[in-house]
Amino acid sequence: MRVRRQCSPVLHRSLSMNQISQRQGVAALTLGAIGVVYGDIGTSPLYTMKEIFSPATGIPLDATHLIGAVSVIFWGLMMIVTLKYVVLILRASNRGEGGIMALTALAAHAAGKTPGRRTALLLTGVLGAALFYGDSVITPAISVLSAVEGLEVVAPGLKPYVLPVSLAVLVGLFMVQRHGTGVVGKLFGPVIVLWFAVLAFTGVVQILQQPAILAALNPLRAVAFLHAQGWHLFVAVGAIVLAFTGVEALYADMGHFGKRPIQLAWMGLVLPALALNYMGQGALLMRDPSALENPFYRLFPQAWLIPAVILATCATVIASQAVISGAYSMTKQAVQLGLLPRMQVQYTSAREAGQIYMPEVNWILLAAVLLAVVGFGSSSALAAAYGIAVTMTMLITTVLTFFVVRHGWGYPLPVALAATGVFLALDTVLVIACSLKFWQGGWFPLVLGVVLFILMATWKRGRELLIENIRNNDPELLPFISSLAKDSMHRTPRTAVYAVANPDTVPQALLHNLKHNQVIHERNLILTVVFHEVPWIPFEERVQVTPLVPGFWKVQVNYGFKNTPDVPQALELCRDQGLALNLFETSYFLSRETIVPTKGAGMTHWREALFAAMSRNAGSVVGFLRLPNNSVIELGTRVQI
């Protein structure tokens, strides 16, 4: 007898509602990804074609070269963005997170079996992170400038106002950062969707008038164009690479939106819109070479120019906002990985922990962006500075991905080389091409990157020397507290939490407390906050409690580099491990070290002096760990390194 199983109407309806809810969630994330992830690469059509055929490249403006250049752009988008990032690199998630920091941690964990290789991978990742800041300066400058330059097309007499208007837009953008982007952020997706729709529509209009441009879909036209350039190839590629800037955002924002929404957004809207617009600009230039003065804005009829300038300015502001937010996020991760000193972090949303504002980063970025705008003066001049930092970051991403594929995923060496070798060759060509523009402005983002790299490397090495000094000079913890347990010293009926970097030596704050106050608390916690090379640490793994001697416990609080530290909240979890605390009867003792540079130690004297200056200006550990101000006692000590 055959039994036929049927779903109840209620269960069927429940499953349908869940499917609808999931689809709505994916749709919302896809819309968000379009607004945040693709703003940078989506505004590249504003200046790319203009720079490819500028006098600096020497590429003739004729049908053959136009079709060839557009073909290189199209197949570059297919190879670099679609195959490398959308297909391969989005698979390399670090517990769902992406970005150069997450990839570095993943590669170092997978392949860093020896200290030398691990250090090399970490330094490579740190360089990639440092170069990101160069991009964070150039992107707002070139994007806003290129959008506002549309005023020149509207009326040539408005040219003197381009620079002041650009500066005003940028200052306004950075000024509103402290208020957060929660409300305005809801408009990002719809505005950028409209932007891509306009890109596609204006491109189609021109293609219909000059369908010969569709020959650019043939990859042989790209090969022929590159082959015809000879050694001039690198100059041409140095301009074409502008079409790919912003591609790193696909991977960096994976943790915010997820892999699938980013892939859907690219394949469903962004790639078609970009391809159609570049072909449309090529078609326009084939019909009217004089449009080279500004091929993007010449796509529009005269009556549409002012709305086009307004929409382009909105799109570039959104693209800049995404880069600025990325700089905040990157800095916070660098601080928690021990690469930069503590900085003030303000949370601008009660609902979204990822929406933060960092005043120091904001004002330094603003100063650098304004310097770039005033110093270079136009989007064409800035285009020379753009690219070198981006392509070096792309190359570093490919190198790190190789180690993840080979050692993290366990593929044989030939497979790992096959998966990344072509991209490694492409990225190398792009880096060489952009390096030719070093003296024309490429030095600017590189200098920024090198300065950040020196700061990061110095801070990391300085902290290592500091902890080594403490370990060598301070007494061991266990024998010391064992002797205290036998002492009849008066004990205060409260809890003392001693925050330390090295849990195996006696905290300086404890020594000061005993020396000056002649008192010890009933409950003493030797607290260590450890940031791991993973994005998130779940609550059940947040705290580890180890009893030492009566009245003393060692407590380790674990965070990922994207977690937000909150020590009082973490201490409440000690109850689950048999250590019940009353946080209202708890005092936090901190040691603040004053660094004294000493010749002949672990770093050159100038780096020690730099580390000492960074240490003096580091943000308060009280705010960083979210300690209650009225329960903190801070004691100072001088440390030679």
Curated annotation (Swiss-Prot):
GO cellular component, one term: plasma membrane
Disulfide bonds listed in the record: none
Catalysed reactions listed for this entry: K(+)(in) + H(+)(in) = K(+)(out) + H(+)(out)
Record carries keyword Cell inner membrane: yes
Example of a GO MF term: symporter activity
Pfam family of the protein (one): K_trans_C
Membrane topology summary: Multi-pass membrane protein
Keywords noted in UniProt: Cell inner membrane, Cell membrane, Ion transport, Membrane, Potassium, Potassium transport, Symport, Transmembrane, Transmembrane helix, Transport
Predominant subcellular localization, coarse grouping: membrane
InterPro entries xref list: K+_transporter, K_trans_C, K_trans_N, Kup
Annotated TM spans: 26-46, 70-90, 122-142, 156-176, 187-207, 230-250, 266-286, 299-319, 363-383, 385-405, 413-433, 438-458
Compartments, record wording: Cell inner membrane
HAMAP family noted in UniProt: Kup
Entry similarity comment: Belongs to the HAK/KUP transporter (TC 2.A.72) family.
Protein purpose: Transport of potassium into the cell. Likely operates as a K(+):H(+) symporter.
Protein name (database record): Probable potassium transport system protein Kup 1
Source organism (scientific name): Polaromonas sp. (strain JS666 / ATCC BAA-500)
